[in-house]
Every structure is written in C-alpha cells, then in structure tokens.
Curated annotation (Swiss-Prot):
Native source species: Pleurodeles waltl (Iberian ribbed newt)
InterPro entries linked: ATPase_NBD, Heat_shock_70_CS, HSP70_C_sf, HSP70_peptide-bd_sf, Hsp_70_fam
Family of this protein: Belongs to the heat shock protein 70 family.
UniProt protein name: Heat shock 70 kDa protein
Gene3D superfamilies in UniProt: 1.20.1270.10, 3.30.30.30, 3.30.420.40, Actin, Chain A, domain 4, Substrate Binding Domain Of DNAk, Chain A, domain 1
Domain of life: Eukaryota
Pfam families noted in UniProt: HSP70 (PF00012)
Cysteine pairs bridged by disulfides in the record: none
GO MF annotation list: ATP binding; ATP-dependent protein folding chaperone
Ranges where the record places region Disordered: 615-645
Chain intervals with Low complexity compositional bias: 623-636
Keywords from the named record: ATP-binding, Nucleotide-binding, Stress response
Length: 645
C-alpha cells in the first residue's frame, strides 16, 4: 500500500475509548474497527506470546489484569509523585514505577519484565487507530490530527504529540476536544447568524467545557475550563468501592487483595453504570468472584446518584468559570451541546438543565463520535481539501492557562493570559536584579496563582554574557510565542550585546528526550514486527488445524464410503490424527514448523484426493487451505485444497 497525497484522518485519543474518522467526498466517515465497532477501547495487553490492542486487550483483562494497561491518558505528561497519579495507582491492577520521576507502567511480556512510558502505550493505541483507518481507505496514511482535552497542560500536549511521532504519524495539529465537537455540531448548519454555543464534554476520564461564538464558519473560542481528572472511570471507582465493603462484611474476605476479582467487579460495575442510564435498577451477577464465592447484588439509579453526587456536581463549577471568562450570562448561550459518553447519565443532564433554568439540552450529535468527526474535518482543511462545506471554515482556539515567568520574590509575571486566542506572540522587557549581574535565569510557568511556587514549572534556561552594568540598566527582551497546537516557544535577547537564548516548552516534567523518542520509535517498529509475526504464526496454525480436521471429517463421511479404499482412508486419518497430536504438543511452534507440517500432510492427502477427483468424487473438495498455500506444499499436479470464504 502506498500513501496518496492529500489524505489525513482525525483521531479522538480517549481515556477509555478512541475513535477515528476521515473526511472524503464531501463528508466525514467514522471508521469501524474489524469487529464492526466505531469506538475502540484504549487498552493494550501483554501476554506470554503477543501484544493485544483495543477490544482483544479489554476482552482478556480479567484473566490478565496486571499486564493489561489502560488509562494511559491519565498518566501522560504527569510526574510520578503527582497526587492524582498516586490516587489512580490504588485503582489500577497494573504496576506503575518511577523513572527519574517520570511514571512508567511495568508489565510482563514474553516472560520478561518490560517498562513503558505512557507516551509509548498511547502510541500503541494510535497505531491501532492508524491501522483501522488504513484498512478502510486501502492505503497507507501518516497525516493526522489528534485531539486533547482543552484543559491539558503544555507538557501533556507535547507528550501526546510525542505519542503520535512514536506511532509513525505526522501530527498536523493538536486540537482541543470541545472545539472539534463544535465543528461536528455546526458543519452544514451555515447561515444561521452568530451563535454562542457551550460544549459540555464529559468522557471516560476528562471533563471540558468550552464556550464558542460560531458565525458563518468561524469558530472562535471565548473561554475554556475543565477538569483533566473527572469522568466515567471515577464513577466506576465509586461503585467498585461501594461493593467492596458488603462483600467483606458478609464473607469476612477482602477482595481488594485479588487483582482479578477487583477487575471482574469493575467490569460488572461499568456495565451496571451503562444500564442505569436507561433503567432505574441494574443487577450485578458474578459467578465465583473470590475463593469460589458468587456475588449477586443490584443497585438502583438513586443509590448510584447518591454515591457520585459530588462528582456529578463537579462539572458545574468549570461551567460557571467559563461563563465568567467569556463575559456571558446563562441566557446568552444559544445552544448547550452534550459530548462524551458520560453525558448519557440522566442525573448529569438534569443538573446541567437545572443550572440553565430548564433549558433544553442539544443531543443532536453522537457523543462518542463527535470529537473524531471534528478532528477529521480539521485534518481535511489542513491538507487543503476544497470541499464546499469546508470553505471559509476557521478555528480560533485559546490558551487554557496563563503563561508567564518568575520575577524577583517568586512573583508570577504573566505574558499570555488564559483564554487568549492562539496562535499569539507577546513580548516584554525585563532587567537585572543586582549590579553587574552576568546572566539571568528565565523560568517559565503555567497557572493562575500570584506566586510561581503555586503554579507549574514548564521549563527554564539561562541567558548569560550580559555586559557588567548597574541593576535595572540592561534591557532583556523576552518573547512568548504559542502556536496553534498550544506549544510554547520562549526566547530572551539582551538588547545591548545581542546575546540570545531560547527554549521550546516541552516540559521535562513528563517530557521525553529526543534520544528516548528515537529509541522508542525503533522499539515500536520491533513490536510491530513481533505482532505481524504472531499474526502470521496464528494464521499458519489455524490453516493447518482447519485442513487436518476438514480432511479427516471428509474421508470419514458417508459421501466417500464407496469412493475411497479402506487403506487410503486409514492413511489420511492416521496422518490427520498425527498432525492434530503434533499441534497439541507443540503449542509454541513457529510459523515455518506449521507450514512444514502442512506440506507433509498435503503430500499424503493430495495424491489420494487427486485420484478420487479424477474418478468424480461427490460433494466437492474439503475446505481449509488457501490455493496458494496448497500449491506450495503439493508435489502433485492435481487440484488443491481450497478455503471456503
């Protein structure tokens, strides 16, 4: 497959599920995976024999909890000692370790202990989404737009971009999820005049609210707010914790010590949570949950709402903040658009509706697919698509947090205020604090507090070689330049000497070095090759198994009773039994060994089958092997064993 020019796709890289779409022929297609689902679990599993990504990984999680990784988005761009990371680790069955304060997940893969940065795990999910898109399009694609929560920090944005690089993607843009959802809401709705739209995006792990003014294809973000650690996973955790105690009281056993039991309970709780969006009660039935004890219980919607009451109210504070920042009143919002799977929860809808004085909520877009839809549109625009409905479409996004530097006394001096439209550039003159100061330390921070100690350090660099001068005389010009992806470049110039230095804020806190990225790209290629080899091995095994069983079944059937001698029948049955026995005793055989066994089996079978065929065998040929494979393995010029589609 070769990649044609001008094609790109949009990926919603979610905490719990991911989604991919492509814009072509004037419309967006949300692409289904090979199981027919339009969303794919953001899960990666490692076993003794292979790596699994997506649904196959999630489906085996209760059997292999400690080696199945999910929630990578909650780790990406964070420090190991972040309070949210430490809190999450109590709920995760897989192990998280520290590598110079960067979190890494530790798993057992093919008998060895392996550690992966969250960027690497996310890149594996991105590889899966890339493969889904390529299977649909029929050719290779590397250009992509990836979405992130609007309230993500600079380091988390850069780490997401790194994950794209590791997945072999050319990341055209990092787009905020609510902005992408707004495109999905408004595309093809031109000519309605200026609208103030509030996007309420509550997913599996993050919450975002953005207020946009949409007018004739121009999407201008007025304000954004959110919580990068609030979503469906937290609701699941509440329900899991709720059921721990009754089990312990009744049976005097603590299931929290058993990762498999906890994982099975979590899966059941997630299912119950979904049921409670449409029913007032849900049953939980788990056979032999722990030490042979069955766990049968139920939960009402009212009890679930009570368990999560504070979490359900949590999004309202960011909504108020966004309204204040946008300088808009509730009544000035024309549409309240729901995005993200967790907005299906009736109580969340009720709280939001009450907040807006009973206003009708807009549920016109698919909450699971809207973000990928908008990302696909933006990808097409960036690739120069000339479709009529994309003409004059323009995104004007904002910086979610204030950006500044530390000045004397640890004061945060802001250069770019939060909710400033990006891309943007701001320049300010600074000077020295003491006489004959030879250099200055530029420390870049992100946050809203007055003192830098309460904000997040993004990066720092020194500007040295300043000529001796009294304090306050040197003029140091500092420029903050933030691009459309929300990634910041900071430069400083001493105006008298011309000395300068600069930094791209990619944040050491969770940021990978260039060398680490190069190493991981090579490892990703190796894992991809391993996956392909495993697929080929399984295919060879399945083909051999199919031929052996089908051949045995055919010659033992009534149709051939009068057509084949007892001696020939015995030869084929014995060889088939021998092959089946070999497979049972050689579960870890390589692809070449399976292919050799297939050739040996076909040597015995083909001459007898050819003789029968020439004699007019009824009922057709037994199925199981592709024609190409059979021809390779046959010394006969007779007919081959064909696979039935």
């Amino acid at each position: 497959m070769s990649a044609p020019k001008g094609v790109a796709f949009g990926i919603d890289l979610g905490t719990t599920y991911s989604c991919v779409g492509v814009f072509q022929h004037g419309k967006v297609e949300i692409i289904a995976n090979n199981q027919g689902n339009r969303t794919t679990p953001s899960y990666v599993a490692f076993t003794d024999t292979e790596r699994l990504i997506g649904a196959p990984a999630k489906n085996q999680v209760s059997l292999n909890p400690q080696n199945t990784v999910f929630d990578a988005k909650r780790l990406i761009g964070r420090k190991f000692n972040d309070t949210v990371v430490q809190a999450d680790m109590k709920h995760w069955p897989f192990k998280v370790v520290s590598d110079e304060w960067k979190p890494k997940v530790q798993v057992e893969y093919k008998g060895d202990n392996k550690t992966f940065f969250p960027d690497e795990v996310s890149s594996m999910v991105l590889i899966k989404m890339k493969e889904i898109a390529e299977a649909y399009l029929g050719h290779l694609v590397s250009n992509a737009v990836i979405t992130v929560p609007s309230y993500l920090t600079a380091s988390q944005r850069q780490a997401t971009k790194d994950a794209g690089v590791l997945a072999g993607l050319n990341v055209l843009s990092i787009v905020n999820e609510p902005t992408a959802a707004a495109i999905a809401y408004d595309l093809d709705k031109a000519g309605r005049g200026e609208l103030n739209v509030l996007i309420f995006d509550l997913g599996g792990g993050t919450f975002d609210v953005s207020i946009l003014t949409i007018d004739d294809g121009i999407f201008e973000v007025k304000a954004t707010a959110g919580d990068t650690h609030l979503g469906g996973e937290d609701f699941d955790n509440r329900m899991v914790n709720h059921f721990h105690e009754p089990f312990k009281r009744k049976h005097k056993k603590d299931i929290t010590k058993n990762k498999r039991a906890v994982r099975r309970l979590r899966t059941a709780c997630e299912r119950a949570k979904r049921t409670l969006s449409s029913s007032t009660q849900a049953s939980i039935e788990i056979d032999s949950l722990f030490e042979g004890i069955d766990f049968y219980t139920s939960i009402t919607r009212a009890r679930f709402e009570e368990l999560c009451a504070d979490l359900f109210r949590g999004p309202l504070e960011p909504v108020e903040k966004a309204l204040r920042d946008a300088k808009l009143d509730k009544a000035q919002i024309h549409e309240i658009v729901l995005v993200g799977g967790s907005t299906r929860i009736p109580k969340i809808q009720k709280l939001l509706q009450d907040f807006f004085n009973g206003r009708e909520l807009n549920k016109s877009i698919n909450p699971d697919e809207a973000v990928a839809y908008g990302a696909a549109v933006q990808a097409a625009i960036l690739m120069g698509d000339k479709s009529e409905n994309l003409q004059d479409l323009l995104l004007l996004d904002v910086a979610p947090l204030s950006l500044g530097l530390e000045t004397a006394g640890g004061v945060m001096t802001v250069l770019i205020k939060r909710n400033s439209t990006i891309p943007t550039k701001q320049t300010q003159i600074f000077t020295t604090y003491s006489d004959n100061q030879p250099g200055v330390l530029i420390q870049v921070y992100e946050g809203e507090r007055a003192m830098t100690k309460d904000n997040s350090l993004l990066g720092k660099f020194e500007l040295s070689g300043i000529p001796p001068a009294p304090r306050g005389v040197p003029q140091i010009e500092v420029t903050f330049d933030i691009d459309a992806n929300g990634i910041l470049n900071v430069s400083a110039v001493d105006k008298s000497s011309g000395k300068q230095n600069k930094i791209t804020i990619t944040n050491d806190k969770g940021r990978l070095s260039k060398e680490e990225i190069e190493r991981m790209v090579q490892e990703a290629e190796r894992y991809k090759a391993d996956d392909e080899a495993q697929r080929e091995k399984v295919s060879a095994k399945n083909t051999l198994e199919s031929i052996a069983f089908n051949m045995k079944s055919t010659v033992e059937g009534d149709n051939l009773k009068d057509k084949i001698s007892e001696d020939d029948r015995k030869k084929i049955v014995d060889k088939c039994n021998q092959t089946i026995s070999w497979m049972e005793n050689n579960q870890m055989a390589e692809k070449e060994e399976y292919e050799h066994q297939q050739k040996e089996l076909e040597k015995v079978c083909n001459s007898i089958i050819t003789k029968l065929y020439q004699g007019g065998m009824p009922g057709g040929m037994p199925s199981g092997s592709s024609g190409a494979q059979a021809r390779q393995g046959s010394s006969s010029t007779g007919p081959t064993i064909e696979e039935v589609d």
